[in-house]
Amino acid sequence: MALSRGTFYFGLALFFIVVELPSGSWAGLEYSQSFPGGEFAVCETCRLGRGKCRRTCLDSEKIAGKCKLNFFCCRERI
């Protein structure tokens, strides 16, 4: 009986270890953003959270600077 109980506890521990492993993602890092303005924010407007880094700005926005990787820092027009 001791062998089956030990096997049960081993299987239970193995189950909890497997459940805690991330499921193909980088443990939620794909949703984290480095700066409040966007994922690749480097210009001051985006760094302060007043703009968003996008490939193309919307019609209601203007370009306020450049971010990394061909992204523009877009800010609402006043």
Curated annotation (Swiss-Prot):
It is found in: Secreted. GO terms for biological process: defense response to bacterium; innate immune response. Keywords: Antibiotic, Antimicrobial, Defensin, Disulfide bond, Secreted, Signal. The keyword Lyase does not apply. Disulfide bonds join C46-C73, C53-C67, C57-C74. Residues 1-27 form the signal peptide. GO terms for cellular component: extracellular region. Has antibacterial activity. Belongs to the beta-defensin family. This is Beta-defensin 12.
